[in-house]
C-alpha cells in the first residue's frame, strides 16, 4: 500500500478542516477495529484525480456499520434520513462533524434498470492508503468506483477514471 502525507500548508482552510475530521475518524475507526475505506470524490482527490471534494464518503463493512455510527454520533450531528430510490443501501447515515459533511455507508446497493446491485464494502476492494495528519486512511480502488459510477450513470466520473488509467 502507498502512503503519502496530503496535509500541506497551502490547502484552503475548509480543506484543512476536512482533513482534520478525516484523521480523527480514521484514528477512532482504527482503535475500534472498524473495516472501512474512503470512497467517491475524496478518494479521487487523494489519488490526484480531483482538485477538491465536498464530503467524506466512508464505506464500511456492513457488520461494522452500527458500531461506526455509534463512534460518529458523539462527534457531530446525525442528519435525518435522506435516501433516494436509486439506492437500497442498508446502512446510510449523514453526519455533520465540525462543519464537514460525512456519509457513513454500509451495505451499499445501487438500483439500475430495476436491478439491485450489491456494492457492499469488502476489505479486498482496498488497494491503497494515504497518511492524513498522521493517520492511515484506506482507499477503495479506482476500478471499484468506476463500476459504481457507471451503475449510477455518472459518465463524467467514469471518463475521469478512464483517462487517468491510460
Annotate the PLM regions:
Residues 22-26, 69, 92:
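Short amphipathic alpha-helical segments and helix-helix/interface helices
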Residues 25, 32, 89-91, 126:
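Residue-level marker for the onset of beta-strands and adjacent loop->beta junctions
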Residues 25-56, 60-63, 67, 141:
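Active-site nucleotide-donor binding segment shared across nucleotidyl transfer reactions
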Residues 30, 73, 131:
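Anion (oxyanion) recognition and catalysis
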Residues 68-75:
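Short amphipathic alpha-helices in soluble, non-transmembrane regions
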Residues 112-166:
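Catalytic cores of NTP-dependent nucleotidyl/adenyl transfer enzymes across multiple folds
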Amino acid at each position: 500500500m502507498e502512503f503519502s502525507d496530503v496535509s500541506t500548508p497551502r490547502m484552503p482552510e475548509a480543506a484543512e478542516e476536512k482533513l482534520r475530521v478525516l484523521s480523527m475518524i480514521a484514528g477512532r475507526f482504527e482503535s475500534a477495529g472498524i473495516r472501512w475505506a474512503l470512497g467517491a470524490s475524496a478518494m479521487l482527490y487523494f489519488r490526484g484525480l480531483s482538485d477538491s471534494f465536498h464530503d467524506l464518503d466512508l464505506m464500511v463493512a456492513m457488520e461494522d456499520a452500527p458500531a461506526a455510527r455509534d463512534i460518529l454520533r458523539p462527534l457531530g450531528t446525525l442528519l435525518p434520513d435522506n435516501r433516494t430510490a436509486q439506492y437500497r443501501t442498508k446502512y446510510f447515515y449523514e453526519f455533520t462533524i465540525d462543519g464537514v459533511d460525512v456519509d457513513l455507508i454500509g451495505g451499499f446497493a445501487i438500483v439500475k434498470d430495476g436491478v439491485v446491485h450489491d456494492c457492499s464494502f469488502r476489505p479486498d476492494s482496498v488497494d491503497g492508503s494515504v497518511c492524513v495528519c498522521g493517520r492511515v486512511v484506506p482507499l477503495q480502488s479506482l476500478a471499484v468506483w468506476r463500476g459504481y459510477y457507471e451503475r449510477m450513470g455518472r459518465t463524467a466520473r467514469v471518463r475521469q477514471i478512464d483517462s487517468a488509467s491510460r
